[in-house]
């Protein structure tokens, strides 16, 4: 039976152009706090941001800031073109930070989560630092402003997308999700994967949490693929299990399923929250996800503090398929850190 990796598209390119833009001097630090070496971007705003500010941007909702990883996510051509046309952090900040009131200041790299939240919401959601004539209010009469500005230097595509957001913002705000942290999943390797082509398969992994999807690269013609690839998911307050699926990439037809599994992330998050700041502790075991008849674990999955980070090694037997095992590592990144 064939399944398609719906909504993901084939693993693509575009990252090189984004990385080239990232090398500009103004883009080598976070647009919001100045932290060095940002690895995230707001595709609709046009700025590069650090991991800590990325968490705040995600909590605002994608209708305000659509966050993508420079290295981990697939970028559409339109998203890449928009980032390049805006020109980077200096250009965007010349609009969004045009009128910072006297006595107010940007947060620094070591600022608290609350300081970042206040500044970033003021900057993008409420547009408090824009020239008043550039602010756009909702056509529904809502007092909440869209994170948009009108500038001849910006592409018509971006402005049009802001106008669309303005007309439909209220129902989106009602469904806005607040996130509590980020889940970094390292897809390590697969073993004895199912054959879906003549003699082999071209496997890739898809992770789904709520409405989010993250996808690995394709490993060509390999039943024992090695990825060692990091994927990132935002975790909301009311989170469920992560759905893992493996597909066989096919150029001319729908990608075939190569197995799936449900990953319970509650033990990891509960253990991490119980201990608080992991940097306060030495290396130690703090939890365990137990193997049982109703999960896909090959063996008990241990949760450890290692080098100041909360990590969990997971080995799963893929379900609803004739063969295949997958090894991965999960790491919990709370937004408050």
From Swiss-Prot:
Compartments, record wording: Golgi apparatus; Cell membrane
Zinc-finger ranges (C4-type): 30-53
Domain C2: 164-281
InterPro entries: ARF_GAP_AGD11/12/13, ARFGAP/RecO, ArfGAP_dom, ArfGAP_dom_sf, C2_dom, C2_domain_sf
Cited function: GTPase-activating protein (GAP) for ADP ribosylation factor (ARF). Binds phosphatidylinositol 3-monophosohate (PI-3-P) and anionic phospholipids.
Keyword Transport: no
Tissue localization of expression: Expressed in roots, leaves, flowers and siliques. Low levels of expression in seeds and stems.
Effect of residue 33 to S: Loss of zinc and PI-3-P binding
Cofactor(s) the protein requires to work: Ca(2+)
Residues at which Ca(2+) binds: 250, 253, 256
GO-annotated cellular components: Golgi apparatus; plant-type vacuole; plasma membrane
Domain Arf-GAP: 15-137
SUPFAM superfamilies in the record: ArfGap/RecO-like zinc finger, C2 domain (Calcium/lipid-binding domain, CaLB)
Biological-process GO terms, alphabetical: intracellular protein transport
CDD domains in alphabetical order: ArfGap, C2_ArfGAP
UniProt protein name: ADP-ribosylation factor GTPase-activating protein AGD12
GO molecular function: GTPase activator activity; phospholipid binding; zinc ion binding
């Amino acid at each position: 039976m064939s399944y398609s990796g719906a909504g993901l598209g084939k693993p693509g390119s575009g990252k090189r152009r984004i990385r080239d833009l990232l090398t500009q001097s103004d883009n080598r630090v976070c647009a919001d706090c100045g932290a060095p070496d940002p690895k995230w971007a707001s595709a609709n705003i046009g700025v590069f941001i650090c991991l800590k500010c990325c968490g705040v941007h995600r909590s605002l909702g994608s209708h305000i800031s659509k966050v993508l990883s420079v290295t981990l996510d697939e970028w559409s051509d339109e998203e890449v073109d928009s980032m390049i046309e805006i020109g980077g952090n200096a250009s965007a900040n010349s609009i969004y930070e045009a009128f910072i009131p006297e006595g107010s200041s940007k947060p620094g790299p070591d600022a608290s989560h609350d300081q970042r939240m206040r500044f970033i919401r003021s900057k993008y959601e409420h547009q408090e630092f824009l020239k008043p004539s550039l602010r756009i209010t909702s056509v529904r009469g809502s007092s909440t402003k869209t994170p948009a500005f009108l500038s001849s230097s910006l592409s018509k595509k971006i402005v049009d997308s802001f106008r669309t957001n303005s007309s439909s913002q209220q129902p989106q705000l009602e469904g806005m999700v607040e996130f509590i942290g980020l889940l970094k999943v390292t897809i390590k390797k697969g073993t004895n994967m199912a054959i879906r082509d003549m003699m082999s398969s071209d496997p890739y992994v898809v992770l789904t949490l709520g409405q989010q999807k993250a996808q690995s690269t394709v490993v060509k013609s390999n039943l024992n693929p090695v990825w060692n690839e990091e994927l990132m998911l935002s975790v909301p307050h009311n989170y469920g299990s992560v759905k893992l699926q493996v597909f066989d990439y096919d150029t001319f037809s729908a990608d075939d399923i190569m197995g799936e599994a449900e990953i319970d992330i509650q033990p990891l998050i509960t253990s991490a929250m119980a201990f608080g700041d992991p940097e306060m502790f030495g290396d130690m075991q703090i939890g365990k996800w137990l193997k049982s008849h109703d999960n896909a674990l090959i063996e008990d999955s241990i949760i450890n503090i290692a080098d100041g980070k909360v990590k969990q090694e997971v080995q799963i037997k893929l379900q609803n398929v004739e063969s295949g095992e997958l090894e991965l590592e999960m790491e919990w990144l709370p937004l408050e850190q």
